[in-house]
A protein has these predicted regions:
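Conserved core of the sugar-phosphate nucleotidyltransferase
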Residues: 1-46
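Left-handed beta-helix
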Residues: 34, 38, 44-116
């Protein structure tokens, strides 16, 4: 994902525009009902066009880039504990390494323990 002037200007694996900074989408989105419907409609369009092998990012990209400024935003999660879960081994990695970090940070936030 590429950001320029605090707006998402690209949302794909290859870059085609200038940007101030870039980052990776972790694939978690909070959408309004209207935006969810637009993504569904765009997905249906891709399917009707026979574009069944496109990455999901392309559909989201189309909706982001055709929406008015300010509709979509991003969060910088640099340094926050997270893991992409694709396989069973990733679940175990999350359980053993990520979850304890999240719980520790939560305890620190609430003043329940000393930092480790």
């Amino acid at each position: 994902m590429c950001v320029r002037d605090n707006e998402i200007v690209e949302f794909r694996k290859w870059l085609s525009t200038s940007f101030d900074f870039l980052g990776e989408s972790v694939g978690m989105f909070k959408l309004s009902h209207d935006m969810a419907c637009q993504i569904i409609a765009q997905t249906e369009l891709y399917l009707n066009q026979g574009r069944r092998n496109e990455a999901y990012e392309e559909i989201i990209r189309d909706v982001i880039l055709t929406s008015p400024r300010g509709i979509f935003a991003y969060e910088d999660i640099t340094g926050l504990p997270w893991i992409e879960i694709d396989f069973q081994a990733d679940v175990m990695q999350a359980k053993l390494n990520i979850l304890p970090r999240i719980l520790n940070e939560k305890k620190q936030l609430w003043g329940l323990s000393e930092p480790t």
